Amino acid sequence: MNNSNRIRLTWISYLSYALTGALVIVTGIVMGNIAEYFNLPIASMSNTFTFLNAGILISIFLNAWLMEIIPLKRQLVFGFILMLIAIAGLMVGHNLMIFSISMFIFGVVSGITMSIGTFLVTHMYEGRQRGSRLLFTDSFFSMAGMIFPIAAAMLLARHIEWYWVYACIGLLYVGIFVLTLCSEFPVLGHKATDQSKPVVKEKWGVGVLFLAIAALCYILGQLGFIQWVPEYATKTFNMNISQAGQLVSNFWISYMIGMWIFSFILRFFDLQRIVTVLAAMATLAMYLFVSTDNPAYLSYYILALGFVSSAIYTTLITLGSLQTKVSSPKLVNFILTCGTVGTMLTFVVTGPIVANNGVHAALATANGLYLAVFILCLALGFFTKHRSHGHVTH
Protein backbone atom coordinates (compact mmCIF):
# COMPACT_ATOMS: atom_id res chain seq x y z
CA MET A 1 0.00 0.00 0.00
CA ASN A 2 1.50 3.35 -1.04
CA ASN A 3 1.70 6.20 1.43
CA SER A 4 -0.81 8.53 -0.29
CA ASN A 5 -3.45 5.77 -0.30
CA ARG A 6 -2.74 5.06 3.39
CA ILE A 7 -3.26 8.77 4.18
CA ARG A 8 -6.59 8.82 2.31
CA LEU A 9 -7.81 5.72 4.17
CA THR A 10 -6.70 7.24 7.48
CA TRP A 11 -8.72 10.38 6.75
CA ILE A 12 -11.74 8.23 5.94
CA SER A 13 -11.32 6.78 9.45
CA TYR A 14 -11.08 10.27 10.98
CA LEU A 15 -14.23 11.48 9.18
CA SER A 16 -16.15 8.29 10.07
CA TYR A 17 -15.68 9.01 13.78
CA ALA A 18 -16.52 12.69 13.26
CA LEU A 19 -19.77 11.66 11.51
CA THR A 20 -20.86 9.46 14.43
CA GLY A 21 -19.89 12.10 16.99
CA ALA A 22 -21.84 14.80 15.17
CA LEU A 23 -24.98 12.65 14.80
CA VAL A 24 -25.01 11.45 18.42
CA ILE A 25 -24.03 14.63 20.26
CA VAL A 26 -26.06 17.16 18.21
CA THR A 27 -29.27 15.44 19.37
CA GLY A 28 -29.57 17.48 22.56
CA ILE A 29 -29.35 20.76 20.64
CA VAL A 30 -32.03 20.05 18.02
CA MET A 31 -34.43 17.93 20.09
CA GLY A 32 -36.52 20.86 21.33
CA ASN A 33 -36.95 22.29 17.84
CA ILE A 34 -37.88 18.89 16.41
CA ALA A 35 -40.43 18.33 19.20
CA GLU A 36 -41.96 21.71 18.39
CA TYR A 37 -41.93 20.89 14.66
CA PHE A 38 -43.93 17.70 15.26
CA ASN A 39 -45.97 19.28 18.07
CA LEU A 40 -44.91 16.62 20.58
CA PRO A 41 -43.67 16.81 24.18
CA ILE A 42 -39.87 16.65 24.34
CA ALA A 43 -39.97 13.46 26.47
CA SER A 44 -41.84 11.62 23.71
CA MET A 45 -39.52 13.04 21.07
CA SER A 46 -36.42 11.78 22.84
CA ASN A 47 -37.64 8.18 22.47
CA THR A 48 -37.52 8.42 18.67
CA PHE A 49 -33.76 9.00 18.81
CA THR A 50 -33.49 5.40 20.02
CA PHE A 51 -33.78 4.54 16.32
CA LEU A 52 -30.43 6.28 15.75
CA ASN A 53 -28.71 4.21 18.47
CA ALA A 54 -30.43 1.03 17.26
CA GLY A 55 -29.18 1.63 13.71
CA ILE A 56 -25.62 2.11 14.97
CA LEU A 57 -25.74 -1.03 17.12
CA ILE A 58 -27.26 -3.29 14.45
CA SER A 59 -24.93 -2.13 11.67
CA ILE A 60 -21.75 -2.48 13.77
CA PHE A 61 -22.82 -5.98 14.80
CA LEU A 62 -23.72 -7.14 11.27
CA ASN A 63 -20.77 -5.48 9.56
CA ALA A 64 -18.38 -7.84 11.34
CA TRP A 65 -19.56 -10.41 8.77
CA LEU A 66 -20.62 -8.12 5.90
CA MET A 67 -17.09 -6.70 5.60
CA GLU A 68 -15.92 -10.09 4.35
CA ILE A 69 -18.80 -10.37 1.86
CA ILE A 70 -19.35 -6.83 0.54
CA PRO A 71 -16.22 -4.83 -0.44
CA LEU A 72 -15.51 -1.85 1.84
CA LYS A 73 -15.53 0.61 -1.06
CA ARG A 74 -18.98 -0.53 -2.19
CA GLN A 75 -20.31 -0.23 1.37
CA LEU A 76 -19.13 3.38 1.66
CA VAL A 77 -20.56 4.34 -1.76
CA PHE A 78 -23.88 2.73 -0.79
CA GLY A 79 -23.70 4.62 2.51
CA PHE A 80 -23.52 7.90 0.58
CA ILE A 81 -26.75 7.02 -1.25
CA LEU A 82 -28.44 6.12 2.06
CA MET A 83 -27.24 9.41 3.57
CA LEU A 84 -28.89 11.37 0.74
CA ILE A 85 -32.13 9.40 1.20
CA ALA A 86 -32.16 10.07 4.97
CA ILE A 87 -31.54 13.83 4.57
CA ALA A 88 -34.20 14.04 1.83
CA GLY A 89 -36.60 12.18 4.14
CA LEU A 90 -36.11 14.79 6.87
CA MET A 91 -36.63 17.66 4.44
CA VAL A 92 -39.70 16.45 2.55
CA GLY A 93 -41.30 14.09 5.04
CA HIS A 94 -43.45 15.75 7.66
CA ASN A 95 -44.49 12.82 9.82
CA LEU A 96 -42.91 10.99 12.70
CA MET A 97 -42.59 7.65 10.90
CA ILE A 98 -40.40 9.10 8.13
CA PHE A 99 -38.35 10.94 10.77
CA SER A 100 -37.81 7.70 12.71
CA ILE A 101 -36.84 5.81 9.53
CA SER A 102 -34.40 8.59 8.61
CA MET A 103 -32.84 8.43 12.09
CA PHE A 104 -32.47 4.65 11.75
CA ILE A 105 -30.78 5.10 8.34
CA PHE A 106 -28.41 7.69 9.86
CA GLY A 107 -27.56 5.13 12.54
CA VAL A 108 -26.95 2.36 10.00
CA VAL A 109 -24.69 4.59 7.85
CA SER A 110 -22.86 5.83 10.94
CA GLY A 111 -22.30 2.32 12.30
CA ILE A 112 -21.06 0.99 8.95
CA THR A 113 -18.60 3.83 8.40
CA MET A 114 -17.32 3.78 11.98
CA SER A 115 -16.75 0.01 11.93
CA ILE A 116 -14.91 0.34 8.59
CA GLY A 117 -12.92 3.30 9.93
CA THR A 118 -11.90 1.34 13.02
CA PHE A 119 -10.88 -1.68 10.97
CA LEU A 120 -8.82 0.43 8.53
CA VAL A 121 -6.72 1.84 11.39
CA THR A 122 -6.23 -1.57 13.01
CA HIS A 123 -5.35 -3.06 9.61
CA MET A 124 -2.85 -0.40 8.48
CA TYR A 125 -0.95 0.18 11.72
CA GLU A 126 0.80 -2.28 14.01
CA GLY A 127 1.73 -2.56 17.69
CA ARG A 128 1.71 0.56 19.84
CA GLN A 129 1.41 2.80 16.79
CA ARG A 130 -2.02 1.24 16.25
CA GLY A 131 -3.12 2.41 19.70
CA SER A 132 -1.92 5.98 19.21
CA ARG A 133 -3.49 6.20 15.73
CA LEU A 134 -6.80 4.79 16.94
CA LEU A 135 -6.82 7.22 19.85
CA PHE A 136 -6.19 10.19 17.55
CA THR A 137 -8.99 8.88 15.29
CA ASP A 138 -11.34 8.71 18.29
CA SER A 139 -10.56 12.36 19.09
CA PHE A 140 -12.47 13.34 15.92
CA PHE A 141 -15.64 12.03 17.64
CA SER A 142 -15.14 14.56 20.45
CA MET A 143 -14.03 17.29 18.04
CA ALA A 144 -17.21 16.94 15.97
CA GLY A 145 -19.16 16.78 19.24
CA MET A 146 -17.82 20.24 20.08
CA ILE A 147 -18.04 21.87 16.63
CA PHE A 148 -21.44 20.72 15.37
CA PRO A 149 -23.52 21.67 18.45
CA ILE A 150 -22.11 25.20 18.10
CA ALA A 151 -22.92 25.21 14.37
CA ALA A 152 -26.40 23.84 15.10
CA ALA A 153 -27.05 26.53 17.71
CA MET A 154 -25.99 29.22 15.21
CA LEU A 155 -28.33 27.88 12.53
CA LEU A 156 -31.27 27.57 14.92
CA ALA A 157 -30.64 31.06 16.32
CA ARG A 158 -31.05 32.39 12.76
CA HIS A 159 -34.41 30.57 12.51
CA ILE A 160 -33.08 28.13 9.92
CA GLU A 161 -35.02 24.85 9.95
CA TRP A 162 -33.50 22.08 12.11
CA TYR A 163 -33.08 19.61 9.23
CA TRP A 164 -30.35 21.81 7.72
CA VAL A 165 -28.23 20.80 10.72
CA TYR A 166 -28.30 17.23 9.41
CA ALA A 167 -27.54 18.48 5.90
CA CYS A 168 -24.39 20.11 7.34
CA ILE A 169 -23.45 16.84 9.03
CA GLY A 170 -23.95 15.18 5.65
CA LEU A 171 -21.03 17.25 4.32
CA LEU A 172 -18.74 14.99 6.36
CA TYR A 173 -19.95 12.05 4.30
CA VAL A 174 -19.32 14.00 1.09
CA GLY A 175 -15.68 14.07 2.22
CA ILE A 176 -15.77 10.32 2.92
CA PHE A 177 -17.36 9.69 -0.49
CA VAL A 178 -14.75 11.70 -2.43
CA LEU A 179 -11.87 10.01 -0.57
CA THR A 180 -13.49 6.60 -1.15
CA LEU A 181 -13.60 7.10 -4.92
CA CYS A 182 -9.87 7.96 -4.95
CA SER A 183 -8.73 5.10 -2.69
CA GLU A 184 -7.89 1.42 -2.89
CA PHE A 185 -9.19 -0.64 0.03
CA PRO A 186 -7.83 -3.83 1.61
CA VAL A 187 -9.62 -6.98 0.44
CA LEU A 188 -11.14 -9.17 3.14
CA GLY A 189 -12.59 -12.65 3.30
CA HIS A 190 -11.87 -15.52 0.94
CA LYS A 191 -10.59 -13.22 -1.84
CA ALA A 192 -7.82 -11.97 0.44
CA THR A 193 -6.42 -15.37 1.37
CA ASP A 194 -3.23 -16.63 -0.19
CA GLN A 195 -4.17 -19.83 -1.99
CA SER A 196 -0.73 -21.32 -1.31
CA LYS A 197 -1.24 -21.10 2.44
CA PRO A 198 -3.89 -22.87 4.49
CA VAL A 199 -6.33 -20.56 6.26
CA VAL A 200 -5.79 -20.82 10.00
CA LYS A 201 -8.52 -19.48 12.24
CA GLU A 202 -7.05 -17.91 15.35
CA LYS A 203 -8.77 -18.40 18.68
CA TRP A 204 -9.64 -15.15 20.39
CA GLY A 205 -9.00 -16.31 23.94
CA VAL A 206 -10.53 -15.27 27.26
CA GLY A 207 -8.74 -11.91 27.10
CA VAL A 208 -11.19 -10.75 24.40
CA LEU A 209 -14.12 -11.52 26.72
CA PHE A 210 -12.50 -9.45 29.48
CA LEU A 211 -11.96 -6.57 27.05
CA ALA A 212 -15.53 -6.73 25.72
CA ILE A 213 -17.05 -6.64 29.22
CA ALA A 214 -14.64 -3.83 30.17
CA ALA A 215 -15.73 -1.84 27.09
CA LEU A 216 -19.40 -2.25 28.03
CA CYS A 217 -18.77 -1.28 31.67
CA TYR A 218 -16.65 1.70 30.66
CA ILE A 219 -19.17 3.24 28.24
CA LEU A 220 -22.10 2.52 30.58
CA GLY A 221 -20.16 4.03 33.48
CA GLN A 222 -18.99 7.08 31.53
CA LEU A 223 -22.40 7.96 30.05
CA GLY A 224 -24.23 7.01 33.25
CA PHE A 225 -21.98 9.49 35.04
CA ILE A 226 -21.89 12.41 32.61
CA GLN A 227 -25.64 12.33 31.80
CA TRP A 228 -26.53 12.85 35.47
CA VAL A 229 -23.80 15.35 36.43
CA PRO A 230 -25.98 18.43 35.65
CA GLU A 231 -28.86 17.07 37.74
CA TYR A 232 -26.48 16.18 40.59
CA ALA A 233 -24.80 19.60 40.55
CA THR A 234 -28.06 21.56 40.50
CA LYS A 235 -29.88 19.48 43.11
CA THR A 236 -27.02 18.74 45.52
CA PHE A 237 -24.96 21.94 45.29
CA ASN A 238 -27.67 24.39 44.13
CA MET A 239 -25.68 25.32 41.02
CA ASN A 240 -27.50 27.02 38.16
CA ILE A 241 -27.80 25.21 34.84
CA SER A 242 -24.99 27.27 33.32
CA GLN A 243 -22.54 26.21 36.06
CA ALA A 244 -23.67 22.58 35.78
CA GLY A 245 -23.24 22.71 32.00
CA GLN A 246 -19.74 24.08 32.48
CA LEU A 247 -18.81 20.94 34.43
CA VAL A 248 -19.85 18.79 31.47
CA SER A 249 -17.94 21.06 29.06
CA ASN A 250 -14.85 20.81 31.27
CA PHE A 251 -15.06 17.02 31.08
CA TRP A 252 -15.21 16.88 27.28
CA ILE A 253 -12.54 19.54 26.73
CA SER A 254 -10.19 17.69 29.10
CA TYR A 255 -11.17 14.40 27.42
CA MET A 256 -10.23 15.70 23.97
CA ILE A 257 -6.92 17.18 25.16
CA GLY A 258 -6.16 13.86 26.85
CA MET A 259 -6.79 12.01 23.58
CA TRP A 260 -4.31 14.19 21.71
CA ILE A 261 -1.62 13.86 24.39
CA PHE A 262 -2.06 10.11 24.90
CA SER A 263 -1.96 9.52 21.13
CA PHE A 264 1.74 10.43 21.39
CA ILE A 265 2.44 8.90 24.82
CA LEU A 266 0.86 5.45 24.36
CA ARG A 267 3.45 4.19 21.89
CA PHE A 268 6.09 4.20 24.67
CA PHE A 269 4.15 1.98 27.11
CA ASP A 270 2.78 -1.54 27.28
CA LEU A 271 -0.94 -1.08 26.54
CA GLN A 272 -2.28 -3.51 29.16
CA ARG A 273 -0.26 -1.89 31.94
CA ILE A 274 -1.07 1.70 30.96
CA VAL A 275 -4.83 1.05 30.61
CA THR A 276 -4.83 -0.58 34.07
CA VAL A 277 -3.14 2.48 35.58
CA LEU A 278 -5.51 4.86 33.76
CA ALA A 279 -8.57 2.87 34.89
CA ALA A 280 -7.35 3.05 38.51
CA MET A 281 -6.77 6.82 38.26
CA ALA A 282 -10.17 7.37 36.59
CA THR A 283 -11.90 5.35 39.32
CA LEU A 284 -10.18 7.47 41.98
CA ALA A 285 -11.02 10.77 40.23
CA MET A 286 -14.69 9.79 39.92
CA TYR A 287 -14.78 8.67 43.57
CA LEU A 288 -13.42 12.07 44.66
CA PHE A 289 -16.08 13.83 42.55
CA VAL A 290 -18.92 11.71 43.93
CA SER A 291 -17.79 11.87 47.57
CA THR A 292 -16.78 15.53 47.95
CA ASP A 293 -18.95 17.99 49.88
CA ASN A 294 -17.15 21.03 48.48
CA PRO A 295 -18.52 22.29 45.12
CA ALA A 296 -15.29 24.24 44.52
CA TYR A 297 -13.46 20.93 43.96
CA LEU A 298 -15.90 19.53 41.39
CA SER A 299 -14.26 21.24 38.40
CA TYR A 300 -10.80 19.96 39.37
CA TYR A 301 -12.00 16.40 39.82
CA ILE A 302 -13.99 16.31 36.57
CA LEU A 303 -11.07 17.80 34.61
CA ALA A 304 -8.81 15.08 36.02
CA LEU A 305 -11.43 12.42 35.24
CA GLY A 306 -11.82 13.56 31.63
CA PHE A 307 -8.06 13.57 31.07
CA VAL A 308 -7.15 10.18 32.56
CA SER A 309 -10.18 8.36 31.14
CA SER A 310 -9.76 9.66 27.58
CA ALA A 311 -7.49 6.83 26.43
CA ILE A 312 -9.26 3.91 28.13
CA TYR A 313 -11.91 2.92 25.56
CA THR A 314 -9.66 3.18 22.51
CA THR A 315 -6.90 1.25 24.27
CA LEU A 316 -9.39 -1.53 25.08
CA ILE A 317 -10.28 -1.76 21.37
CA THR A 318 -6.61 -1.68 20.39
CA LEU A 319 -5.72 -4.44 22.86
CA GLY A 320 -8.60 -6.46 21.44
CA SER A 321 -7.24 -6.12 17.91
CA LEU A 322 -3.82 -7.27 19.18
CA GLN A 323 -5.15 -10.53 20.65
CA THR A 324 -4.68 -12.14 17.22
CA LYS A 325 -1.60 -12.08 14.99
CA VAL A 326 -3.69 -10.74 12.08
CA SER A 327 -6.25 -8.04 12.96
CA SER A 328 -9.77 -9.47 12.81
CA PRO A 329 -12.73 -7.24 11.83
CA LYS A 330 -15.09 -9.61 13.68
CA LEU A 331 -13.08 -9.23 16.89
CA VAL A 332 -12.86 -5.43 16.65
CA ASN A 333 -16.57 -5.14 15.85
CA PHE A 334 -17.44 -7.46 18.74
CA ILE A 335 -15.77 -5.09 21.22
CA LEU A 336 -17.31 -2.05 19.48
CA THR A 337 -20.73 -3.72 19.70
CA CYS A 338 -20.32 -4.32 23.44
CA GLY A 339 -19.42 -0.65 23.90
CA THR A 340 -22.51 0.37 21.90
CA VAL A 341 -24.66 -1.89 24.09
CA GLY A 342 -23.34 0.16 27.02
CA THR A 343 -24.65 3.28 25.29
CA MET A 344 -28.08 1.70 24.77
CA LEU A 345 -28.28 0.62 28.43
CA THR A 346 -27.41 4.04 29.89
CA PHE A 347 -30.92 5.17 30.80
CA VAL A 348 -32.27 1.62 31.15
CA VAL A 349 -29.84 1.05 34.04
CA THR A 350 -29.53 4.51 35.58
CA GLY A 351 -33.17 5.63 35.19
CA PRO A 352 -34.61 3.21 37.80
CA ILE A 353 -31.65 3.88 40.13
CA VAL A 354 -32.34 7.63 40.04
CA ALA A 355 -36.08 7.05 40.51
CA ASN A 356 -35.60 4.80 43.55
CA ASN A 357 -32.37 6.00 45.19
CA GLY A 358 -31.54 9.43 43.75
CA VAL A 359 -28.90 10.86 41.42
CA HIS A 360 -26.01 10.25 43.83
CA ALA A 361 -26.71 6.51 43.68
CA ALA A 362 -26.47 6.61 39.86
CA LEU A 363 -23.08 8.33 40.07
CA ALA A 364 -21.91 5.79 42.67
CA THR A 365 -23.03 3.00 40.32
CA ALA A 366 -20.97 4.58 37.52
CA ASN A 367 -18.01 4.66 39.89
CA GLY A 368 -18.53 0.95 40.59
CA LEU A 369 -18.51 0.25 36.85
CA TYR A 370 -15.18 2.08 36.52
CA LEU A 371 -13.84 -0.07 39.36
CA ALA A 372 -14.99 -3.14 37.42
CA VAL A 373 -13.04 -1.87 34.38
CA PHE A 374 -9.91 -1.58 36.54
CA ILE A 375 -10.32 -5.14 37.89
CA LEU A 376 -10.89 -6.54 34.38
CA CYS A 377 -7.83 -4.71 33.01
CA LEU A 378 -5.73 -5.99 35.92
CA ALA A 379 -6.94 -9.57 35.36
CA LEU A 380 -6.28 -9.19 31.62
CA GLY A 381 -2.56 -9.15 32.41
CA PHE A 382 -2.73 -12.92 33.03
CA PHE A 383 -4.52 -13.71 29.74
CA THR A 384 -3.53 -11.13 27.12
CA LYS A 385 -1.84 -12.40 23.95
CA HIS A 386 -0.52 -9.07 22.64
CA ARG A 387 2.95 -9.68 24.08
CA SER A 388 3.30 -13.22 22.70
CA HIS A 389 2.29 -11.91 19.25
CA GLY A 390 5.12 -9.39 19.31
CA HIS A 391 2.79 -6.37 19.45
CA VAL A 392 4.74 -4.50 22.11
CA THR A 393 7.03 -2.46 19.93
CA HIS A 394 6.44 0.31 17.39
UniProtKB/Swiss-Prot annotation:
This is Protein TsgA homolog. It comes from Yersinia pseudotuberculosis serotype O:1b (strain IP 31758). PROSITE patterns: MFS. GO terms for cellular component: plasma membrane. It is found in: Cell inner membrane. GO terms for molecular function: transmembrane transporter activity. The chain crosses the membrane at residues 11-31, 51-71, 76-96, 101-121, 134-154, 162-182, 206-226, 246-266, 274-294, 302-322, 334-354, 363-383. InterPro entries: MFS, MFS_dom, MFS_trans_sf, MFS_TsgA, MFS_TsgA-like. It is a multi-pass membrane protein. Keywords: Cell inner membrane, Cell membrane, Membrane, Transmembrane, Transmembrane helix. It holds the Pfam family MFS_1. Its main location: membrane. Belongs to the major facilitator superfamily. TsgA family.
